[in-house]
Amino acid sequence: MTKQIITLVGRPNVGKSTLFNRLSIRKKAIVHDLPGVTRDRKYTDGKIGSFEFLLIDTPGLDEHPNSMGERLIEQTTKAILEADLICFMVDGRSGILPDDKLLSSFVRKYNKPAILVVNKCEKAFDFDKEYYKLGFDSMIAISAEHGTGLIDLYDEIIAKLPEEESIKTNIADPIKGDCLQIVVSGRPNAGKSTFINALINDERLLTGPEAGITRESIEIDWQYKNNHIKLIDTAGLRKKSTITKSLEKLSASDTINSIKFANTVILMIDALAPLKQQDLNIASHVVNEGRSIVIVVNKWDLVKESEKEAFQEEFYYQINTHLPQVKGIPVLFISAINKQNIEQVLDACLKIYKIWNKKITTSKLNEWLNFTTEAHLLPLQKGGRRVRVKYMTQTKTRPPTFKLFSNNPEKITDSYTRYLVNNMREAFDMPGVPIRFIYVKTKNPYV
C-alpha cells in the first residue's frame, strides 16, 4: 500500500511552506514573508507522531493580473485531485479574507476530506462565526513557525486518515543509494522547467515567458530505463550584482545547495542568449563542487539552420577555453518545447554518472603513471636529483580522486598536473568529469 497524500492549500503567505517544512522529514521549501513564494507543487515525505505520509505544498492562490494565475490554479487542482486529505490553511492574525472564502468554495467542490488549519496562532485562539462559514467540519489552530498545536493536528489527521492505513517505511537517504540526483541549473528563462515537463510528459512545473518563475528547488522522482532518478528543478542563477531582493538571495542559496548535493548537473543554456560569463561561472562552480556536468543548449529549433554550424564551433571553443580542467564535457542541442533530443540528455547523464563513479585498480594506475612520467619527465631539483612521482592510488570516487606520492610534491607545477590529468582522461576514458590529484610527500626523499 502506498502512503496517503496530504495536500496543503490556501492563499499566499498563510504559512503553507512553513508547515510543509515543519512536517517534512527534511527541509524543502523556501520560507519568506513575501506572498507567492511557492509557485509549483512540491512533494516530500512527511511525518507527524508515528504517522508517515506524502505531503504536497501548493502555490498560494489569489487574483493574478496575468496568465500565471491560471497556471497556478492548474498546479493546485492537480494536487487536490491527488490528495487523500486537504489541509486548508488560513491566517489567524489577519482573519478571514474574501480570497479565503473563494478558495474554500473551490476546495469543497472536490468533496475531499478536509481540515481547516488556522495558522499563526501563537496565543489562545477562539473560532468566530467567520471560520465556520468556510464550511469545514474540522478546525484546528496552530503555529507552524513555533510548532504549537501539532498534537491537535495529529489527532485531526488520524481521525480523517486512520494511522493503521499508513505505511511506516524508512525514508531513503537523499544523497546515498542508487537514486541518481540530477539538478537542472542555469540562468533564468533558459527553459529548465519546460525541459523537465517534457521529460516526464506532464505539466508538473509552472512554465511561461516570465523570467524567474521557479523560485526554489523542486524535486521529482522518476524512472528512466530502469534507473531511479530524482530530477531537481532550480531557480535561475543571476549574477551576484543583480540579486537584490532577499527572496532572490534565498533562491540562489537554495540552488547552490542543490548543486552541492547533486550527482549530475545539467547546465541549461538559452540558444537565443549568447553564452555569458554567468554560464561559465555556474559551470565552474559545478566542477569545483566535484559534480559531473552535462551542458544542454535549449531552444535549438529557433536558431537559423544557416547559423547552427558557426554557433556550435564558437560554443565549443568557449567551453574548451574557459573550462580546460574538464575536457570532454557532453554538450547537447535540444528543443524542450518540441521534445527534440531530450532523451539524449538523460542518456548522457547516465553515462557521465558511471564515469563519475569509476574505480581504477592500483596496478593499472601505476602502470599508466610510470609510462606517462617517463614520456614527460619532471624537473630536476637542486643537486641534480629529479622530482619523481613514485606511486599512486585511488582514494575515492564521486569525483575520482587520487593520491600521488612524490619525493618533492612542492616542485610539481600546475601545468604538469594538467598534463597528468588530461593524459589520464584519455587513457581511462573519463571525459567531462572532475579529476582530483592529492600529492603526498614520501618519507624517503631519495625514492
Curated annotation (Swiss-Prot):
Domain of life the protein comes from: Bacteria
Key words of the record: GTP-binding, Nucleotide-binding, Repeat, Ribosome biogenesis
GO BP term (any one): ribosome biogenesis
Domain KH-like span(s) in chain numbering: 358-443
SUPFAM superfamilies in alphabetical order: P-loop containing nucleoside triphosphate hydrolases
Binding site for GTP 1: 10-17, 57-61, 119-122
Single annotated GO MF: GTP binding
InterPro entries for this protein: G_ENGA, GTP-bd, GTPase_Der, KH_dom-like, KH_dom-like_a/b, P-loop_NTPase, Small_GTP-bd
Keyword Lipid metabolism attributed: no
General function of this protein: GTPase that plays an essential role in the late steps of ribosome biogenesis.
UniProt similarity note: Belongs to the TRAFAC class TrmE-Era-EngA-EngB-Septin-like GTPase superfamily. EngA (Der) GTPase family.
Protein name from the UniProt record: GTPase Der
Species of origin: Rickettsia africae (strain ESF-5)
Gene name tied to this protein: der
